[in-house]
Amino acid sequence: MPLVTRNIEPRHLCRQTLPSVRSELECVTNITLANVIRQLGSLSKYAEDIFGELFTQANTFASRVSSLAERVDRLQVKVTQLDPKEEEVSLQGINTRKAFRSSTIQDQKLFDRNSLPVPVLETYNTCDTPPPLNNLTPYRDDGKEALKFYTDPSYFFDLWKEKMLQDTKDIMKEKRKHRKEKKDNPNRGNVNPRKIKTRKEEWEKMKMGQEFVESKEKLGTSGYPPTLVYQNGSIGCVENVDASSYPPPPQSDSASSPSPSFSEDNLPPPPAEFSYPVDNQRGSGLAGPKRSSVVSPSHPPPAPPLGSPPGPKPGFAPPPAPPPPPPPMIGIPPPPPPVGFGSPGTPPPPSPPSFPPHPDFAAPPPPPPPPAADYPTLPPPPLSQPTGGAPPPPPPPPPPGPPPPPFTGADGQPAIPPPLSDTTKPKSSLPAVSDARSDLLSAIRQGFQLRRVEEQREQEKRDVVGNDVATILSRRIAVEYSDSEDDSSEFDEDDWSD
């Protein structure tokens, strides 16, 4: 439907009923002439409106041109009369002055009531007025205008504004989500790109001739041929090389001790059966001593002669020596003497059986296990150990004497200070806890007030957002094309309501 801005009336000059007169021709002529004069009058009125608007716009344009001319004249005078030798501008003066910034005002609200043309306004005034429903607005509890339920000119704008603001919030939430994921997984973006599959290798193989191309059946699952030719001329199988040169990793003593025969059977056969490559035999030979050395601590007689030469055994025997002290510490009653002798000397086993006969050691054994689990609760047992440890030192006074004091002292020192610290901590912590609780209670009491203040600030922030198309669109464009985290501060509080 076209919007008629100016309508010249009357539109029809001669379409009228004639009165009962004798001279009808003269009557029609007079009526037509009168209607023409009316049309000229309405035309002159619209011409006045048109030329009046043109005059207003021309006057505004002239004032802008005159102000610009004045600025150019002043600038020209400053440029021509400025002498750089006499007047020196300091760097501070240059920095204090603000740079030129264009303040372009965007045209908006073109179809507002104030910008409504006069003829359109006259046409609008000829329409029927809406019912006076605004009189019921004071009686509404929701605060909405009653007339908007009947007619709401701003309905479409409000709908569009709500959609734009929601889209902006969604964009900001998505950006914050990506930032959070990027912080949690910094290496997520460093994904290796998928390799492009080409037939270049295939054509390179076919370049020498079809008869030299190896079929896929001849290649294993790993892409290498099953048979390998070594430099010394021997041929070995890939499976054989893997089985002999890479023996399974040695297990713990507990796992290897129950089945020594199984480990011994596995080690010797590989060199005998798969004896094609010389390197494999060497690898298996080296692997044998290592395996036998691990098994040797549990079964010394059988393991060394079968799996390993006598040479490596003494070299690898010292390392396993430290492990035995922990078992006597757990299973044998006298824990302090074994630990003291185990650290300086290599042969700890003979020392434990010499001390058990003493009756003093038979009584303390039950207490030591509980202290190992809970030192601070039972301080007396550690103190009793030095008294019991006094008799044994006479046979070898220097060695056992030093170890017990540090061991017992280390046990005794932590046992005594904890109670002191425990007694001091409650004294210092009690007032702090009471203060924290009082602060928490005061914060809870002020919860409703704080929540109200937050709601007021949120409402103020929403009101700050411009209620026009240009501001909303500029805000959305800035959010979409910006990567800074400051842009999300405006809608951070909205996450609480999600």
Curated annotation (Swiss-Prot):
Downstream effector molecule involved in the transmission of signals from tyrosine kinase receptors and small GTPases to the actin cytoskeleton. Promotes formation of actin filaments. Part of the WAVE complex that regulates lamellipodia formation. The WAVE complex regulates actin filament reorganization via its interaction with the Arp2/3 complex. Pfam families: WH2. Expressed in all tissues with strongest expression in placenta, lung, and peripheral blood leukocytes, but not in skeletal muscle. It comes from the Eukaryota. Belongs to the SCAR/WAVE family. This is Actin-binding protein WASF2. Keywords: Actin-binding, Cell membrane, Cell projection, Cytoplasm, Cytoskeleton, Host-virus interaction, Membrane, Phosphoprotein. Signal peptide: none annotated. One of its GO terms (biological process) is negative regulation of stress fiber assembly. Binds actin and the Arp2/3 complex. Interacts with BAIAP2. Component of the WAVE2 complex composed of ABI1, CYFIP1/SRA1, NCKAP1/NAP1 (NCKAP1l/HEM1 in hematopoietic cells) and WASF2/WAVE2. Directly interacts with BRK1. Interacts with FNBP1L (via the SH3 domain). Changing Y150D: Constitutive induction of the formation of actin filaments. Strongly enhances formation of lamellipodia. Residues 298-407 have a biased composition (Pro residues). Residues 252-263 have a biased composition (Low complexity). The modification Phosphoserine is found at S474. It is found in: Cytoplasm, Cytoskeleton; Cell projection, Lamellipodium; Basolateral cell membrane. Binds and activates the Arp2/3 complex via the C-terminal domain. Interacts with actin via the WH2 domain. SMART domains: WH2. One of its GO terms (molecular function) is protein kinase A binding. Residues 436-453 form the WH2 domain. One of its GO terms (cellular component) is early endosome. It comes from Homo sapiens (Human). Changing Y124D: Constitutive induction of the formation of actin filaments. Strongly enhances formation of lamellipodia. PROSITE patterns: WH2. Residues 173-203, 240-435 are annotated as: Disordered. Its main location: cytoplasm.
